[in-house]
C-alpha cells in the first residue's frame, strides 16, 4: 500500500530514484510530510526545496529537444499534468530517447515523434553537491596548476637559471660581431685573445647552468609524477564496483598506462622549450635594433608555424584517438587471452585467437603508421617554413650588407639571434605530436580520475556491528534500462542467526549480499545494519566487519600467511593458524615445504581449487567478523574438505550472523531459517523440514531434483 501511495506522486518517486542515483538515502514519508503540505503531491517549488534539503543541487530549466543531448543526465522531465518521467539517455544517431516511466516503473525507448508528443519543454537537472565539488577538481591540464604553485620555489629557480642562459645566448652573437667587424678589420690579436677567453667562460657557464636547469626541472617534475601516480592508484581503488563491471580490464589498464605519456612529457624538453620561447621578446628587441626589415621576416614566419599547426592538429588528434582505441583493444584482448589460457588450450582454439590477434594487430599498426606519416608531414612542413625564411633572410641580408645598411658582423649576429628565437619554435613544432599525445592521455586518464568514487554520505561514526540486518522494500536493478533484479524484498535477520538463501540462478541471491556490502545503493528501500542505513555509512567501516567468501576467490602472489592476514599484516600467528584450522586448511598447509610462508603464485596458481577456497575462508574468518557471507563458498570443495568445514560450521557461526548462499541444499539444511527466492522475490521461508512439508513449493521441487 505504501509503495502504491508513493507511486501516485510521481514527483516523489522521481526524487527518490535520483537521490539513490547520487548515493543519497531518503525516507519518502518524511519528505512527503515536510513538503507535500496539501496532500496533492510535490509542487515544482516543493520538489526543488526537497532536493535542496537532501544536499542535491536541482535547477529547473526550459530546453529545446534539439539541445537535450548537451545536458547532464539523468534528469527529470517535469509535466504540468503530473505525468513526470526520467530522461536517462539521448541517442542522437538514431533519434531515440531512453526514458524511465515512473508510472509503470519500467524503462522505455521512445522515438523522436513519441518523445515530442509527451515533452513539454521543462527539465529539472539534478547533481549532488559532492559531484559539483568534484567537477571543480576535474582532472585536465588545470590539475597541474596547484602542483606548479606547490613547487613554485623550484620552478622559480628554474626560471632564474633560464634568464641567465638567455643572457649568455645573447652575449655570444655580440662576441662574433665584434670579431668580424673589429678584430678582423684592425688585426687586433690582443682583443681576439680576450674575446676568446670570455667566450670560453660563457660556454662553460652555459653548459653548467643548462645541466643544472635540467636537473632541477627533472627533480620537480618527478615529484609531480609521483603525486599523480599515487593519486591515480588511490582513486582507482576507491571507484565503485560498477565502474569495473562496465569496463574491460585491458581498457582500464590502457588508460592507466597513459600516465607514461604524461611522465615523458613532463620530464622531456618540451616545457623547457616553452620557457626559452618566452624569452624571445628580448631577442626580438635586439634583432629590431640590428635590422627591422629582417626582424619583420622572422615575425612574419611565426603565423605560418601557427597556421600549419592549426591545420595539422585536428587530423593528428583524430588519428591519435584511433591509435589509442586500437591499442586499448589489443591490451584488452591480450589480458583476456592470458587470463583465459587454460580454456584456450583445453578447447584448442589457439588458431582462432591468433587470427583475431593478427587482425587487431594489423589494425593497430595501420593506425600507428597513419599517425607517423601525418607527424612526418607536419615536421617537414615546419622545415619548409624554416628553410624558406633562411633563404629570404640570406637574400635580404646580403642586399643590406652590399648597400651598407648592415655590416657582415651584424648579419652573422642577427642570424645567430634569429636561430635562438626560431629554435624553440622548431622544437615545439617538432614536439607537437607529443603535445597532442599528452592531450589525449590527459583525457583518457581523466576518464578514470574524473569518475566519482564511492561517496560517504555523512561519514557517520557508527559503533561496532552487532549483526542485526534488515532489508526494507528493496527494489534494485543494475542499470536504468536493465530488468529488475530485486522487487519489493523485505527481510529481517536477527543477530547471531544463520540464514540460508536458495533459488534458481538469476533469482537475486548474490545481489542481496552486494547491497549488504554497499557495493550498490538500492533503487528503492533501505538496507539497515543494527538500525543504521548503509547509504549513510562509511563503506570501509562496513566491509572491515563483514567476512565474505565467494565461489571464485582471488589470492595474491604472496605467502599463505600474508594472504590470510591480508587486512592486518602484523596479525599474530596464533590468529592466522586458528582461522586456518576453522577453515580446514591447517593440515594441508603444514604439509607444504615452506608451510605458511609458501608463495601461492599469481591468483593462487600454485594451489588446487579446494586449497585456494579454504585459504579464502580462513581469510574471511581471521578478523572475527560479526557478519559472515558464504556465496557458494563450498561448491568448489571436494567432499572431504566440505565435510571438515561443515563439522566446524558450529564454531564458525558462533557469535556472528551468517548468510549461506548455495545451490546444494545440503549446505543450508541446518540453517536457522532458509529463504527461497524466485525472480527477485522471496517466495518461501522457514526451516528445512517446514519447507519440505509444502510439496508444491519451490524448495521441495529443488530438493526432489537433487535427490533424483
Swiss-Prot record:
Subcellular location: Cell inner membrane
Signal peptide start-end: none
Protein EC: 7.4.2.5
All residue ranges annotated as the ABC transmembrane type-1 domain in the record: 155-437
Effect of residue 112 to T: In strain: Serotype A1 / PH101
Catalytic activity: ATP + H2O + proteinSide 1 = ADP + phosphate + proteinSide 2
Main localization, broad class: membrane
Keyword Mitochondrion attached: no
Gene Ontology, cellular component aspect: plasma membrane; type I protein secretion system complex
Function, in words: Part of the ABC transporter complex LktBD involved in leukotoxin export. Transmembrane domains (TMD) form a pore in the inner membrane and the ATP-binding domain (NBD) is responsible for energy generation.
Notes concerning its domains: In LktB the peptidase C39 domain, the ATP-binding domain (NBD) and the transmembrane domain (TMD) are fused.
Family membership: Belongs to the ABC transporter superfamily. Protein-1 exporter (TC 3.A.1.109) family.
Protein name according to UniProt: Leukotoxin translocation ATP-binding protein LktB
Species of origin: Mannheimia haemolytica
